[in-house]
């Protein structure tokens, strides 16, 4: 096996769940043809997390071999909501919400993928002028029985839960994207398999070569149970501050450390195998490996210097209990005092009042290093508030 074949083999094996059709994809990669690598995203939320990063890293690896990424911004399908893995119909988003989410999503996307080797396309380029006859013609290519073969649809149908007609259209619309951009390969998670294969079918029906499909594993979130998801709060966002990424890495269950190393870092497989052996024999403290993981991630997303500073701050603030030298400030209106619950929300130390109250009840809130539990406590200018293990804000 020559160097090029070895590199391609590594890309198609590590961090990959399934390739359809693997031999055909290998031949394409070795042919010298510049491939169009399709990745679509629905900007239904404004943030990318490590779960998305698994596929994005594959795209970057293939860009480095000279291939072109075609990024589809699903400004139409986002208003429907991808039903993949959903147990209920998702709420529709407004066009304004979708555009706002897409802006921040693209900024984060290019932290991982090479912008100069990426073609960005918006679904509205072809769907803005789609007529009813076009919808009928497209939907006539498939049957309701085919759509209900999806695992998530089948479960909802069997349970008597509603499935909207727009959701049935979703896989066809995603497939039509592949036709419009002449996709050679489409990327996605294993929960997207049905949609990706519909793309192959539709391309063939319309006289194009069917795209290859590369599926990546689903990354388990920091709770160790569910798929990483912002809605579940078990995510590590790629745009979060380095100190926040570092702290969240420390919270992942020990049994997930190796999976994270494999899927979202470039640590050699031989070194990961050594980590596995050391953990199995009690030769390494898992925290040491989590710190290594955090530094690797922050170096990818920011810089080596940012990684070292985040490591040092974690040691000072979390392990030694020191107050950080630099912390966010939250300005009080006219210098007046404010209820601690309201301050926690205003300073973005918690996302909701219920979360803030829960922190108080669990003893997770301090004012000037003194634990408090009374939600009626007030915060005044100069106070330093700590929420959870590592979040601080100064009232000014």
UniProtKB/Swiss-Prot annotation:
It comes from the Bacteria. Signal peptide: none annotated. One of its GO terms (biological process) is tyrosyl-tRNA aminoacylation. PROSITE patterns: AA_TRNA_LIGASE_I, S4. SUPFAM superfamilies: Alpha-L RNA-binding motif, Nucleotidylyl transferase. It is found in: Cytoplasm. A motif ('KMSKS' region) lies at residues 227-231. Its main location: cytoplasm. SMART domains: S4. ATP binds at residue 230. The keyword Aminoacyl-tRNA synthetase applies. It is an enzyme of class 6 (ligase). InterPro entries: aa-tRNA-synth_I_CS, aa-tRNA-synth_Ic, Rossmann-like_a/b/a_fold, S4_RNA-bd, S4_RNA-bd_sf, SYY-like_C, Tyr-tRNA-ligase, Tyr-tRNA-ligase_bac-type. A motif ('HIGH' region) lies at residues 43-52. It catalyses: tRNA(Tyr) + L-tyrosine + ATP = L-tyrosyl-tRNA(Tyr) + AMP + diphosphate + H(+). Transmembrane segments: none annotated. GO terms for molecular function: ATP binding; RNA binding; tyrosine-tRNA ligase activity. Its EC number is 6.1.1.1. Residues 338-396 form the S4 RNA-binding domain. Keywords: Aminoacyl-tRNA synthetase, ATP-binding, Cytoplasm, Ligase, Nucleotide-binding, Protein biosynthesis, RNA-binding. One of its GO terms (cellular component) is cytosol. Belongs to the class-I aminoacyl-tRNA synthetase family. TyrS type 2 subfamily. Catalyzes the attachment of tyrosine to tRNA(Tyr) in a two-step reaction: tyrosine is first activated by ATP to form Tyr-AMP and then transferred to the acceptor end of tRNA(Tyr). NCBIfam families: tyrS. Homodimer. This is Tyrosine--tRNA ligase. It comes from Dehalococcoides mccartyi (strain ATCC BAA-2266 / KCTC 15142 / 195) (Dehalococcoides ethenogenes (strain 195)). The gene is tyrS.
